[in-house]
Amino acid sequence: MNVTLLIPARYGSSRFPGKPLAPINGKPMIQHVYERASLAKGLTAIYVATDDDRIKDAVEGFGGKVVMTSPDAASGTDRIEDAITQLGLKDDDLVVNLQGDQPLIDPISIEQIISLFERHPGEFGMATLGFEITEKCELDDPKHVKMVFDNEFNALYFSRARIPFGRDTNDYPVYKHLGVYAYTRSFISTFAKLPLGRLEDLEKLEQLRALEHGYKIKVAISAFDSPEVDTPEDIRVCESRLAVD
């Protein structure tokens, strides 16, 4: 099975302009993401998907591969679709979508999501990762997307609110969504053509589009958190963790 990992990266950000190139312990953040992803077993190729020459130059500067995408991409999925079209991937090829602001991603988590397709061939077209929340401050923070799934680890819903809600107790596990996806190439094309979902638009969570249109999203529960860098303040947390990793 051919497995291509794509790291979409935008330079523009209202909260953190130039985020992919922000230095963390002497390296741009995108380099940390790329190098950690490259430690995962089972990958055929890794590319950064970007529309910015500054990111392109930085990635090629450390020996990484880049695919340039249209600056008019309306969403992350559109950027992925653009990239895989240029790369000429086949319908049954697997694509892993790893966000460029996850410098603490554990390679084992990437291997875990790939293994779902190896163990359940043809049962679903899309998969993602979850992690049991251990920090109470994340439970009601809309920045941390929560998720619920059935007994077969098929996603039921994603929300910025705390789900599920315990009427009589607070002593139960709550899982957050880690922004890593894997899909077959054919499913990405199908997904990109689906109309915007009502719940997707309400929560501003693109993955809800698949659920609203009746498609399965298989979930793997990771033993490793992968916090995203959203603000310059998050850089300090990453530097501390990477120093002891």
Swiss-Prot record:
Gene Ontology biological process terms, A to Z: lipopolysaccharide biosynthetic process
EC number(s) recorded for this UniProt protein: 2.7.7.90
Signal sequence interval, chain numbering: none
GO molecular function, a single term: 3-deoxy-manno-octulosonate cytidylyltransferase activity
InterPro entries attached to this UniProt entry: Cytidylyl_trans, KdsB, Nucleotide-diphossugar_trans
Gene Ontology CC: cytosol
Pathway in which the depicted protein is active: Bacterial outer membrane biogenesis; lipopolysaccharide biosynthesis
Classification via SUPFAM superfamilies: Nucleotide-diphospho-sugar transferases
Primary localisation category: cytoplasm
Location relative to the cell: Cytoplasm
Domain of life of the native organism: Bacteria
Keywords of this entry: Cytoplasm, Lipopolysaccharide biosynthesis, Nucleotidyltransferase, Transferase
Coiled coil: none
Catalytic activity: 8-amino-3,8-dideoxy-alpha-D-manno-octulosonate + CTP = CMP-8-amino-3,8-dideoxy-alpha-D-manno-oct-2-ulosonate + diphosphate
Keyword Transferase among UniProt keywords: yes
Family, per entry: Belongs to the KdsB family.
Entry function: Activates KDO8N (a required 8-carbon sugar) for incorporation into bacterial lipopolysaccharide in the Shewanella genus.
Protein name, as recorded: 8-amino-3,8-dideoxy-manno-octulosonate cytidylyltransferase
Organism, scientific name: Shewanella sediminis (strain HAW-EB3)
